[in-house]
């Protein structure tokens, strides 16, 4: 089966845009959420519609519940019902236990965990049949915890748990799975040199191809016997076992 009525958060750029391209085509309807990337969202909409999809743009700040409600209302008015939700939008800022503040904590939890939970709840009320999917884009770091990016890591660990528990709650009508990417696209804080150093430190010593993440989304949608699973696509980053004391290095 294929998803035909799709909502993607953070769908205008990076991994979200790649997933939108993968899932679009004739007889497909997509609601693409964006926050600040209006021009990129509009350009992507034109490209996807050129190849036969119907695309609706939904602007919103996922840290605000009223914006989430607006996105759902727009999606319901345009799509009538849903069969696929991709919770991709994410906030990724650095803090530590020693210096985090309420603003950082609440924003990470709101965008990375609360918003997917609310969207999951509303999605479950607007489906038909037994072949519906939710895909959560998480992070490989949930499998190998560190004290860095404290609020982000806690929020993504919560999204991992949401994936498992909602798979239990929403079966058999909705399958819920997750993808935990590794180094795929350089973030704004990284130099090319730092990003290369990051992916060369993985066991497979390679950058993750975003198309592999898109293929995994498509695989989960078409696999009717899989739910509650989280797949690491990370060049083995979550398997890294070497530490300075083991290697005898400073």
Question: What is the meaning of each model-derived region?
Answer:
Residues 144, 227-250:
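Short C-terminal tail/terminal secondary-structure segment
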Residues 133-171, 183, 237:
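Catalytic loop of short-chain dehydrogenase/reductase
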Residues 28-42:
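Conserved glycine-rich Rossmann-like NAD(P)H-binding loop of the short-chain dehydrogenase/reductase
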Residues 209-233, 238:
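C-terminal substrate-recognition "lid" of short-chain dehydrogenase/reductases
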Residues 96-97, 104-109, 198:
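Substrate-binding pocket helix/loop in short-chain dehydrogenase/reductase
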Residues 12-14:
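Conserved glycine-rich cofactor-binding loop
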Residues 88-93, 236:
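Conserved NAD(P)H cofactor-binding loop of Rossmann-fold oxidoreductase domains
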């Amino acid at each position: 089966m294929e998803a035909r009525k799709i909502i993607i958060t953070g769908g205008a750029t990076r991994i979200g845009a790649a997933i939108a391209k993968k899932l679009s085509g004739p007889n497909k309807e997509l609601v693409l959420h964006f926050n600040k990337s209006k021009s990129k969202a509009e350009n992507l909409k034109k490209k996807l519609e050129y190849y036969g999809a119907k695309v609706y743009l939904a602007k919103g700040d996922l840290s605000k519940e009223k914006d989430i409600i607006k996105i759902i209302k727009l999606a319901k008015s345009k799509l009538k019902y849903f069969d696929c939700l991709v919770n991709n939008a994410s906030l990724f800022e650095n803090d530590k236990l020693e210096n985090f503040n309420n603003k950082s904590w609440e924003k990470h939890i709101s965008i990375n965990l609360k918003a997917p939970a609310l969207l999951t709840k509303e999605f479950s009320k607007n489906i038909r049949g037994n072949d519906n999917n939710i895909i959560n884009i998480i992070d490989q770091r949930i499998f190998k915890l560190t004290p860095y990016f404290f609020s982000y890591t806690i929020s993504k660990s919560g999204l991992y748990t949401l994936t498992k528990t909602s798979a239990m709650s929403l079966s058999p009508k909705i399958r819920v799975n997750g993808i935990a990417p590794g180094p795929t696209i350089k973030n704004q804080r990284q130099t090319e040199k730092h990003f290369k150093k990051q992916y060369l430190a993985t066991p497979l010593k390679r950058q993750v191809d975003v198309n592999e993440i898109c293929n995994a989304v498509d695989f989960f949608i078409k696999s009717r016997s899989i739910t509650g699973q989280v797949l690491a696509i990370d060049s083995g980053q979550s398997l890294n076992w070497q530490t300075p004391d083991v290697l005898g290095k400073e």
